[in-house]
């Protein structure tokens, strides 16, 4: 692999932090973070994985007590008891020291972990809630990061499957010090990189058959109304879609539709002249067909029979394919002016290598490849498991246009912080199905400016556009005010962007990070800190019938004590100001 695909890692832990037996190894990385390995052949993994890059923590204070039943390991935070046999619920336990709970703060191997949750791969086709994965913080004081099935990162930049039948767990036992737990998660798995400044403004995104002319007319109208955008998201109709059926569905494509965009470089240049950056949508799954302009060159390189137009199969498990994938499909488009890619992978988590998720491959290599010309890299794709925070930005998928979907998004975005995933981009306003509701659109847009990425989106339906002037006056004014305010917040957001990188604190911070001992902080699921200076509780339910007010639950502390209120406010004006606290 090229040098650009080689990731900086430091995966070997200090020997002073290791306790090694015949078939186990315990590594005390911090006084609250312990790596637990078991391998029948007594061979342990010191290379980096997809998830874990850095195990070179400083020397840690701990002591070991050996007895007839096994060993006990003590730190200032933890008490580990282990019988030195294959990991089991009766043979391995860790207790969190301190007065957290009478019995809930003891973990036994294999038990279900009750943490404060993390995030999910996607919100595709979701109406309301979806099951969330694990995070690294818990009211019980501990959580588990299971790295047993991660692929190994090789020194040359490629990956290989790890040995089967091993246990490789990381025990996070930080009590209620959630910030420190998250900080050490980043220390272990790598920092969240900074985003380019332009990513923090407004994005215009729609699945729609635009042409160069119609797109620029739309941007002109936004300019006339003083509605600023910094990112243009061009969905799949940028490429040929109406292809001969022998080439497939046209869902995957890499050749510009010259009927719509006769001069792509000119089109992208016009957007750059406006201060906008562009991402193109790609669905890689169907490979490269004979109708693509770069097909012959890529087929020759891949050894495919191009005279018979055999397809170049999408094989992300092949380094040869991935090299050609960038060389022929993406670099030429970037030379024309494409800034980053929207990787719209929806075909599951299997490929030719067992345990290797194609989504992770595309996210990892697209992000690394995007820095090729010295730019600050970015990609735009779904979540592929712990460690995905290294490849911002996350695309949460095709949600339903319902109040239930809006009501879930603030909570979904907030819990993602618990697994270090701080840059979700949602389909603001929803993508499909559901119903047309002006109030819902206004509220969703208002929430959008206090979400990590403000990306208005809609489907190809003629009735689903998110242009503010499509809605009645009060909604139009609310949307326009929101979009202008988001643009004005770019300096603040960029400061928080740096804070996320430098201080390991995502933009969205759950209330319980600041107030872990207050039960109320866990009850206001849709309330959060938006950077260091703002607290947000968006309105995510319809206004009260017969009144021009809406209700949202808010909790905060004052010098006089703790207050829980049900806040009612005007839909557009008063609630707008309230939401912007």
Task: Briefly describe each language-model feature range.
Residues 193-350, 389:
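Aromatic-lined carbohydrate-binding/catalytic grooves of carbohydrate-active enzymes
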Residues 203-206, 233-234, 272, 276-289, ...:
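Aromatic-lined carbohydrate-recognition surfaces of secreted/lumenal glycan-active proteins
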Residues 5, 29-68:
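A low-complexity, Ser/Thr/Gly/Pro-enriched, surface-exposed linker/loop concept
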Residues 41, 78, 142, 149-151, ...:
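Short, glycine-/Ser/Thr-/acidic-enriched flexible segments
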Residues 303-342, 374-402, 456-478:
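Alpha-amylase-like alpha-glycosidases and glucanotransferases acting on alpha-linked glucans and related
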Residues 223-231, 260-279, 331-339, 366-377, ...:
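Secondary-structure transition/capping motifs at alpha-helix termini
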Residues 64-199, 206-207, 212-224, 578-581:
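Catalytic and substrate-binding clefts that recognize carbohydrates or anionic sugar/phosphate headgroups
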Residues 367, 387-394, 408-412, 416-426, ...:
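Catalytic core of carbohydrate-active enzymes
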């Amino acid at each position: 692999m090229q040098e650009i695909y080689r990731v900086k890692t430091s995966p070997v832990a200090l020997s002073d932090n290791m306790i090694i037996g015949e078939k186990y190894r315990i590594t005390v990385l911090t006084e609250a973070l312990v790596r637990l390995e078991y391998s029948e052949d007594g061979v342990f993994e010191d290379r980096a994985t997809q998830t874990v890059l850095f195990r070179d923590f400083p020397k840690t204070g701990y002591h070991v007590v050996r007895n007839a039943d096994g060993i006990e390991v003590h730190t200032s935070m933890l008490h580990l008891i282990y019988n030195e046999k294959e990991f089991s619920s009766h043979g391995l336990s860790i207790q969190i020291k301190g007065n957290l709970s009478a019995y809930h703060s003891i973990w036994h191997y294999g038990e279900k972990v009750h943490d404060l949750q993390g995030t999910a791969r996607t919100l595709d086709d979701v109406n309301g809630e979806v099951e969330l994965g694990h995070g690294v913080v818990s009211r019980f004081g501990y959580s588990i990061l299971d790295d047993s099935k991660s692929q190994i990162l090789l020194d040359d930049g490629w990956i290989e499957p790890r040995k089967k039948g091993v246990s490789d767990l990381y025990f996070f036992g930080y009590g209620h010090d959630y910030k420190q737990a998250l900080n050490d998660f980043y220390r272990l798995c790598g920092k969240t990189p900074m985003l380019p400044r332009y990513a923090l403004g407004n994005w215009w995104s729609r699945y729609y058959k635009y042409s160069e002319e119609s797109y620029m007319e739309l941007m002109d109208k936004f300019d006339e109304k003083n509605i600023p955008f910094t990112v243009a998201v061009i969905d799949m109709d940028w490429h040929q879609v109406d292809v001969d059926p022998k080439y497939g569905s046209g869902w995957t494509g890499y050749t510009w539709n010259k009927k719509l965009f006769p001069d792509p470089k000119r089109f992208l240049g016009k957007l750059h002249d406006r201060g906008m950056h562009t991402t193109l949508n790609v669905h890689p799954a169907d490979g490269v067909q004979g109708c693509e302009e770069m097909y012959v060159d890529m087929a020759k390189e891949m050894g495919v029979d191009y005279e018979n137009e055999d397809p170049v199969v999408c094989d992300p498990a092949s380094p040869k394919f991935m090299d050609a994938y960038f060389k022929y499909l993406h670099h030429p488009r970037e030379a024309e002016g494409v800034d980053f890619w929207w990787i719209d992978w929806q075909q599951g988590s299997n490929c030719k290598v067992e345990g290797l998720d194609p989504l992770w491959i595309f996210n990892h290599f697209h992000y690394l490849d995007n820095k090729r010309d010295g730019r600050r890299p970015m990609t735009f794709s779904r979540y592929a498991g712990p460690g995905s925070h290294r490849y911002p930005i996350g695309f949460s998928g095709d949600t339903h246009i319902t109040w239930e979907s809006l009501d879930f998004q603030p909570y979904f975005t907030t819990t993602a912080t618990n697994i270090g995933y701080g840059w979700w981009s949602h389909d603001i306003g929803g993508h499909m199905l559901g119903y047309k509701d002006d109030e819902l659109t206004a509220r969703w847009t208002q929430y959008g400016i206090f979400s990590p990425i403000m990306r208005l989106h809609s489907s190809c339906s003629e009735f689903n556009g998110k242009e503010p002037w499509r809605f009645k006056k009060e909604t139009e004014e609310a949307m326009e005010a929101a979009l202008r305010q988001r643009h004005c917040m770019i300096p603040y957001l960029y400061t928080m962007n740096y804070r996320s990188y430098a201080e390991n604190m995502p933009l969205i911070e759950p209330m319980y990070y600041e107030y872990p001992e207050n039960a109320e902080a866990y009850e206001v699921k849709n309330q959060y800190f938006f950077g260091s200076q703002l607290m947000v509780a968006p309105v995510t339910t319809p206004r009260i019938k017969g009144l021009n007010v809406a209700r949202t639950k808010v909790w905060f502390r004052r010098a006089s004590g703790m207050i829980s209120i049900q806040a009612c406010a005007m839909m557009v004006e008063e609630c707008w100001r309230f939401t912007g606290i």
